[in-house]
Regions:
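Ligand-binding pockets and gating/stacking loops
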Residues: 1-179
Length: 179
């Protein structure tokens, strides 16, 4: 309670009682206090490595993550900071479409989401379908994840992606951020 007198540390919205919710609440307070942050990394609660019991594990984990991010967005909006933050959600691996009893194995293709008041909300790539899997029974990629990083570096952080992303010169730049 020693921070109770500082308005930036008062939480104006209710966050889920989970690690990600507490981390995002603290991040909102740091931003409200004027901390000059440009990039922060956090891990979501729950298990997304669903080789078994996928429906229950994935649904519960995804709900916790979505509820925490929604609370964070509402918190930023209440503090007038919504245009200062962009959130990228991603996994380092996808899932294969075929079930192995009650779950799925690691796969090559996955999804990423960009959220925030300045995110365009555009879908990049196309759903590859379930009838044209690759030779290892993975979903086929329909976009290169490096394009997303090039776009975020240039459109959000104002940095040239060339020195950071190998082969950036030959990659597209989907519009991910509104001016």
């Amino acid at each position: 309670d020693s921070l109770a007198g500082f308005s930036e540390f008062e939480v104006p919205v209710s966050y889920p009682d989970a690690n990600l919710g507490r981390q995002l609440s603290g991040l909102a307070a740091l931003l409200a206090a004027g901390m000059p942050l440009h990039c922060v990394s956090m891990s979501a609660d729950g298990s997304y490595d669903t080789h078994s019991d996928q429906v229950a594990e994935f649904d519960g984990s995804l709900k916790l993550t979505c509820d925490a991010i929604l609370a964070f967005q509402r918190d930023l909006e209440s503090r007038g900071l919504q245009d200062r933050v962009l959130v990228e959600l991603w996994s380092e691996f996808g899932r294969r479409p075929e079930e192995n009893d009650t779950g799925t194995d690691h796969g090559a293709a996955g999804a990423a989401f960009i959220t925030g008041s300045r995110a365009t909300g555009e879908m990049v790539g196309e759903f590859p379908g379930l009838t044209t899997l690759d030779e290892d029974d993975n979903l086929r990629h329909t976009s290169d994840f490096r394009e997303m990083y090039c776009s975020l570096l240039e459109q959000w952080l104002g940095q040239d992606a060339g020195p950071i992303i190998p082969g950036a010169g030959s990659l597209g730049r989907p519009k991910l951020v509104r001016s």
